[in-house]
Amino acid sequence: GHIPSDSIVMKARRVGEGNQAAWAPCPIEEVVATIRAEKPALVFAPHVETSSGMLLPDDYLRAVADAVHEVGGMMVLDCVASGAIWVNMEATGVDVLVTAPQKGWSGSPCCAMVCLSAAARKAIDGTTSSSYACDLKKWLQIMESYEAGGHAYHATMPTDALVRLREVMQETRDYGFEKVRAEQVALGAAVRELFESRGIRSVAADGFKAPGVVVSYTTDPEIQNSKKFLALGLQTAAGVPLQCDEPADFMSFRVGLFGLEKLHNPGRSVAQLAAALDA
């Protein structure tokens, strides 16, 4: 499918010495210079990257978007793991935002959720997809048919899961988007403080620590593969490679702080983790 025909990866890098040094995104000056030199049609970035627990701040996103717009391209932001750290597309310059139901929205995994800027909506009409299931222009036509009061069919939809997603999105809206964002920030800070107080070091460097995905170093394979937490009734995610030229002995474990239950009950969420660490 030649998706894409060519690609350049701007890797994160360590910001210190030692085998448990923290990691930060590629310096923004280097990213901007590469965009201006290579003139890509699209720049993809993860808002929150889940192997490292790293978040790209709004000013970083804005600088990337401005640079790619200068050369006639567009910016695509992966927000699947953003949790309740909402992204303002207009303020950051993001053209295409992609997310999903199953993390911050507390929904069932059933679809992709795609938001388009005015420029992206205009550009998509001139594209042809090489995929049937992932033909974004076709799905856009389906959506716009329904919005106009009509009916159209492309593939069978996971209707029940979509209805559940709609319900939980309405629940979050009624509770307050800003309120739940503040809960996400507070819970992430509390969990990171808990880990650091026990000498557990963060993979993400200061200034780039995501509040919804906390990735920390370990030297214990039973923590890395989540078996020790599972034995205590907690589900964590196994650590995975960064694929950024990390040392051979790189080992981590991941804690996802997603879902309204965790966010609305931060004290309980932190206490459960603390009890597991003390066991």
PLM regions and their residue ranges:
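Short beta-strand segments
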Residues: 2-4, 44-46, 76, 99-100, ...
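Conserved active-site and cofactor/substrate-binding residues in soluble primary-metabolism enzymes
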Residues: 26, 30, 59, 63, ...
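Active-site phosphate-binding strand-loop segment of PLP-dependent enzymes
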Residues: 18-79, 83, 96
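Active-site cofactor/substrate anionic-group-binding motifs, chiefly glycine-
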Residues: 1-13, 235-244
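Conserved active-site segment immediately N-terminal to the catalytic lysine
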Residues: 90-102, 112
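Conserved C-terminal alpha-helix-loop-beta "cap" of PLP-dependent enzymes
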Residues: 196-268
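Active-site C-terminal subdomain of aminotransferase-like
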Residues: 102-197, 261
